[in-house]
Design a protein with these regions (language model features):
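Hydrophobic membrane-insertion alpha-helices, especially the h-region
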Residues: 19-32
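Long, hydrophobic/aromatic-enriched structural stretches that serve as scaffold segments
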Residues: 139-153
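N-terminal Sec-pathway targeting helices
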Residues: 9-21
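Signal peptide processing junction and immediate N-terminal pro/mature segment
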Residues: 32-46
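N-terminal secretory signal peptides that target proteins for export/translocation
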Residues: 1-11
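Primarily the internal scaffold of c-type cytochrome electron-transfer domains
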Residues: 43-90, 106-139, 155-457, 462-467, ...
Length: 522
């Protein structure tokens, strides 16, 4: 008889190999930025009054030495822009630690999140430094629009820049995210950055410099106007960065779509914005899935009934919390992965005995009794379903993430008779694995396995499962003559961040962190 277990996706740490690399670039706090007004010879400094330097003067001073390599748009080749179309003083991007004085829980969660480490974490640092070294810092504007907005808008991304960068440690900071005014839908920085402020008065006046915590507490409505708007709760807001492309300016070839999680969500059952999905699902958004309310033990001022929207944004990034040794973040990610996200079902067997007619099709297995004999040729059909994810699985950067089906057949003594999709002793994935991956191709036809997207010329394979859809993996083996007793067949989906090639490249040593959804028959 067939026994089908309940399926689930669960994060599981299998092995942690000692790391040999340090974390990326850390910010330098308390630095002074000085701009010279060349007409008068005066020096304007903002070390004592952050944000006080006039924006127009700042923008003019930066423009004098800025490399407008991609035309008059200073933020190209990203799609980001500011409300004025020009630079924003670096000091206006306040440290997130300032917010943490009152928003204690949100700040603590953000600090361990992928957003809070979007620039400094070593995997990104390795990649963006390669781009800078191979093509120039101007090209990193494409990436930094979503990994370090303050660097982009302050004009720091030009050769010989004198802009001090205390914001590097913050990545996607509180003030950067909460200052975005609108989204354009174009991806890779498809947003308009507003003028950062701590208070916005009813008449639209923006206040930042010299504002104290007490002034904020005395005028919560103005603080709310500065920090919150309906846009922040929409999928369009998240899609401003969770949608990407390789523009012609970057690869010297042509526009290539990289990923479009926002578009995938819109086409899913969860958005209620598309007539195409077959399955009916309750309305979900990016926020309701990735920012569920959780307890606020540090008494965050924004907590309601002791809870606030999680600023951990748990998803599938196990690499950052393992690298920085943050068990709380890793636990949040693991719990998120334990939800009923994927389904995997050993749905059918095809049996062909020697000397017999056509093969026999047995399905569904949980409703059929059957037996097999030595020398039978068995083909197992495994169905993998993206049940409760509002976008593709795996999403986004499939070229250096790795998801695959692990399939094993064992005898009663536990001896492996057949396997596919396993991690070899050297840490690399079995080449026969049924995997979900994007294979990028360089100009010379070789595989672009280090995420050097600026060298991408084409996509050889892009295997994934869209929301609400299924994939079938087939495995064929022959029952050994000497086998007696039942066989055990097990299938599970494994996921690791990152591929061994990329993690070794970035760190020198790898971190094995795998998540799984599984099914088995006996």
């Amino acid at each position: 008889m067939t026994q089908i277990t309940n399926t689930r996706l669960q994060g599981r740490t299998w092995q942690r190999i000692a790391l040999t690399a340090a974390a990326g670039v850390l910010g330098i706090f308390g630095a002074v930025f000085t701009v010279t007004n060349r007409a008068s010879g005066d020096h304007l400094t903002t070390s004592d009054n952050p944000g006080k330097l006039p924006s127009a003067l700042y923008a003019s001073a930066i423009a004098e030495t800025y490399d407008f390599k991609f035309g008059p748009n200073p933020f190209a080749p990203s799609n980001a822009t500011s409300v004025t179309g020009t630079f924003i003083p670096a000091e206006m991007f306040l440290s997130s630690a300032r917010c943490g004085a009152c928003h204690t829980d949100a700040h603590a969660q953000w600090r361990q999140s992928a957003h809070g480490n979007a620039f400094r974490e070593p995997f990104y640092q390795k990649n963006v430094k390669d781009l800078q070294n191979q093509k120039g810092i101007e090209f990193t504007r494409h990436c930094e629009s979503c990994h370090n907005p303050a660097a982009l808008f302050s004009g720091a991304l030009t050769k010989g820049s004198k802009v001090k960068r205390p914001f590097d440690d913050d990545g996607v900071s509180c003030i950067a995210c909460h200052s975005i005014q609108s989204a354009t839908g174009r991806g890779i920085g498809g947003y308009v950055m507003g003028e950062p402020a701590l208070l916005v008065k009813e008449d639209g006046t923006h206040l930042l410099a010299g504002i104290t915590d007490q002034q904020i507490l005395d005028d919560i409505p103005s603080h709310r106007r500065a920090m919150m708007r309906p846009l922040l709760k929409t999928a369009d807001f998240c899609a401003a960065c969770h949608k990407s492309q390789v523009p012609k300016e970057l690869n010297d070839y042509k526009f290539i779509r990289a990923f479009a999680v926002g578009d995938e969500y819109q086409m899913s059952s969860f958005s209620k914005e598309s007539p195409h999905p077959y399955y009916v699902r309750d309305k979900e958004t990016c926020n309701t899935c990735h920012m569920k309310r959780e307890p606020a033990p540090l008494f965050d001022v924004s907590a309601k009934l002791g809870k606030l929207a999680s600023h951990r944004w748990p998803a599938a990034n196990t690499a950052i919390p393992v690298f920085y040794k943050w068990p709380e973040q890793l636990d949040a990610v693991n719990k998120f992965l334990e939800t009923d996200a994927l389904g995997i079902d050993i749905f059918a067997l095809r049996r062909k005995s020697p000397g017999t007619g056509p093969e026999e099709f047995i399905a569904p297995l949980n409703r059929s009794s059957f037996s097999i004999k030595p020398a039978d040729r068995i083909t197992a059909e495994v169905v993998i379903t993206n049940k409760n994810i509002g976008h593709s699985f795996p999403p986004e950067l499939r070229d250096f993430y790795e998801a695959f089906v692990e399939f094993t057949v064992t005898d009663e003594q536990g001896q492996t008779l057949y396997q596919s999709g396993f991690i070899k002793p050297n840490g690399y994935l079995d080449e026969t694995a049924h995997n979900y991956k994007t294979y990028l191709v360089k100009l010379d036809g070789s595989y672009n396995d280090k995420h050097h997207i600026w060298r991408t010329r084409g996509i050889a394979q892009n295997n994934q499962i869209q929301s609400g859809r299924s994939d079938v993996a087939r495995y064929q083996f022959r029952v050994p003559q000497e086998v007696a007793g039942p066989l055990h067949i097990k299938a599970r989906v494994q996921y690791r961040r990152f591929t061994r090639v990329f993690s070794d490249y970035a760190l020198g040593k790898s971190v094995e962190v795998l998540g799984t959804a599984w099914d088995r028959i006996h």
